[in-house]
A protein has these predicted regions:
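Terminal-proximal interaction/regulatory segments of ATP-powered molecular machines
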Residues: 495-549
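N-terminal accessory targeting/assembly segments
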Residues: 1-213, 535-549
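Conserved P-loop NTPase
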Residues: 419-504
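Active-site phosphate-binding and catalytic loops of NTP-dependent enzymes
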Residues: 155-165, 210-225, 313, 407-410, ...
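Conserved lysine of the Walker
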Residues: 298
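Walker A (P-loop) phosphate-binding loop of P-loop NTPases
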Residues: 295
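P-loop NTP-binding catalytic core
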Residues: 174-287
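Switch/coupling sub-region of P-loop NTPases
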Residues: 277, 282-291, 302-427
Length: 549
């Protein structure tokens, strides 16, 4: 008899023994009374005494009362450690968890169409019924520790769930089998965690992430990029064909509450003068491009300044993976799609061509990398206001990328771009920060040399972490288009700066509140300015070289 047949026979016998044991348990029965978890009555679900060799610098809940994060600091090696603390289980509870998981999973597979409104209550009821069938009596402390792991498995991201729940984490990276995950933490930057995956577990998890987001991944097609159900971006690799250390993934977490311009000012990514300038430029239909390296904040900034788009304007966004979140009523969002069955891929180029038929006033493209850039600049040249991002570390690099393969935008068409913001992820002291390094203005083609001319309107000064401002061609263009005098232009900038200063001073980080005041300003600027002036601790000064009263 072959080994395969013997293994199959063993599996069948195990199932028969399992069913017989289950039948005996059902006949015996038990009664489980489930009550709400109360820390004083039931005791803590999780505890932790710290890590040897590490000084505790932070501890906070990510899923109270089940899981918290411990941040330790190793002074000898000058490094932090991110340690996830979850409920402990003894051997009996671990076996019970596996049995519950199998039975609940089977029920979910059988009833896959059913989506309960309150999955937590349904899960608790399923656990109660199964425990009664098993004849197992457990206390509420053990019940809720088991509940945590089951809920994490069926409704969350399994062992990755605490990291996905942590609001301070921006990126999560898994580099292979048995390798600790690394996270990019808003406070402690790149940190090693105590979370890792073995081969079978990691392969299954990568496949699950792909399937949950409607993508296919296999050994024959081992790499895919996708958007997870919660909106996070994920780059997935399966097996060892393209990633020799094993399956891997990188997740760029999605924030349900996007950064506002006030938040970017508070972080000193931009200053008030830059943000007032961008507000007026966006209102005046100037096209913008945000450039920078990986994790420099390009998309975050573009998403933030889109809150300045006038409320009734039609906005259309085009993305490979869903990142943009506009609080705008007249907004049409579109995302690329891989071919399904015999259908064709729907690319950014296809979506951009289609977008022009929707007659949008503002077109926002997640990132330009190829042929869609030509259509984007054609849209600019035909009067559409467009915003996008690009990977590049300087103004000249942006121009070089646009003019050469694979993008190949003619120099004459690049003239239609008005403003170029270049962002960077850098250090100020011991902290890693994001700064808008330069705001450049495209002035046109030099008739003498044939080169594309640009000037710098704002520039970050690394020495004192401040921003300097120079003359602005864009502001002069806006003044002429609006028929304003220089003093009227200065007043418009000052009023916008007052509103932004007020929003920053009031710590208005909720994008709904921020957008509400911006929209109110568009409806009645005088009323908003008077209210803001009355509530400000001090008035603002507009530093606008070349714009004198």
């Amino acid at each position: 008899m072959s080994n395969d047949l013997l293994a199959d026979l063993d599996r069948r016998m195990d199932r028969l023994r399992h069913r017989a044991k289950r039948a005996a348990e059902v006949l015996r029965g038990s009664a489980v009374e489930v009550t709400e978890y109360e820390p004083q009555a039931h005791g803590p679900l999780v505890s932790f005494d710290g890590l040897d060799g590490y000084e505790e610098v932070d501890r906070y809940w990510v899923n109270a009362p089940y899981a918290f994060v411990y941040i330790g600091y190793d002074g000898a090696n000058d490094e932090h450690r991110y340690h996830v603390v979850e409920p402990g289980l003894d051997d009996f509870e671990q076996d019970l968890l596996e049995t519950l998981y199998d039975d609940i999973r089977d029920a979910l597979i059988y009833d896959a169409v059913y989506e309960p409104e309150d999955p937590e209550s349904v899960l608790k009821e399923q656990m109660k019924q199964l425990l009664e069938e098993y004849g197992v009596e457990i206390g509420m402390n053990a019940f809720y520790r088991l509940f945590y792991y089951l809920h994490r498995a069926f409704e969350g991201f399994e062992k990755l769930d605490p990291l996905m729940q942590d609001p301070y984490i921006e990126d999560v990276s898994c580099d292979g089998y048995g390798v600790p995950l690394f996270v990019y933490h808003a406070e402690y930057t790149d940190v090693e965690t105590n979370v890792s995956y073995e081969q079978e577990e990691l392969d299954g998890f990568v496949v699950r992430l792909a399937q949950q987001s409607g993508r296919h991944i296999s050994i024959g097609d081992p790499v895919t990029e996708t958007t997870l159900p919660d909106g996070s971006r994920a780059e997935l690799a399966l097996g060892e064909e393209v990633t020799p250390r094993g399956s891997a993934f990188t997740i760029r977490k999605y924030s349900e509450d996007p950064f506002t311009p006030a938040r970017l000012v508070d972080l000193n990514t931009f200053d008030l003068d830059q943000m007032a300038y961008l507000w007026l430029a966006i209102e005046s239909n100037k096209s913008l491009l945000f450039a920078g390296g990986t994790a420099s904040g390009k998309t975050t900034s573009m998403n933030a300044v889109s809150m300045f788009i006038p409320p009734r304007s039609k906005v259309l966004t085009i993305e490979d993976t869903r990142e943009l979140s506009l609080y705008h009523e007249n907004w049409l969002s579109s995302v690329t799609r891989e071919a399904i069955g015999e259908g064709d891929d729907i690319t950014m180029y296809d979506l951009l061509r289609s977008a022009l038929r929707h007659r949008p006033e503002y077109i926002v493209v997640g990132e330009v990398r190829g042929e869609e850039a030509m259509t984007l600049f054609q849209a600019m040249n035909t009067g559409h206001t467009t915003y996008s991002t690009m990977h590049a570390d300087s103004v000249q690099t942006v121009i070089n990328r646009l003019e050469n393969d694979p993008i190949n935008v003619p120099r004459a068409m690049i003239q239609s771009l008005d403003i170029l913001c270049v962002q960077t992820l850098t250090h100020v002291g011991t902290k890693r920060v994001r700064r808008n390094r330069v705001i450049a203005e495209i002035e046109g083609i030099d008739q003498r040399t044939g080169d594309l001319d640009y000037s710098t309107a704002f520039e970050w000064q690394a020495a004192d972490d401040s921003f300097s401002q120079r003359d602005s061609v864009v502001l002069d263009d806006i003044r002429e288009e609006r028929g304003w005098s220089r003093s009227e232009l200065l007043r418009e900038l000052r009023n916008r700066k007052r509103v932004l200063h007020y929003l920053t001073q009031q710590n208005v980080e909720d994008y709904r509140q921020f957008t509400a005041l911006i929209n109110e300003y568009y409806a009645n600027p005088e009323r908003v300015v008077e209210r803001v002036k009355a509530e400000l601790d001090e008035d603002v000064v507009v530093d606008a070289p070349g714009v004198a009263e």
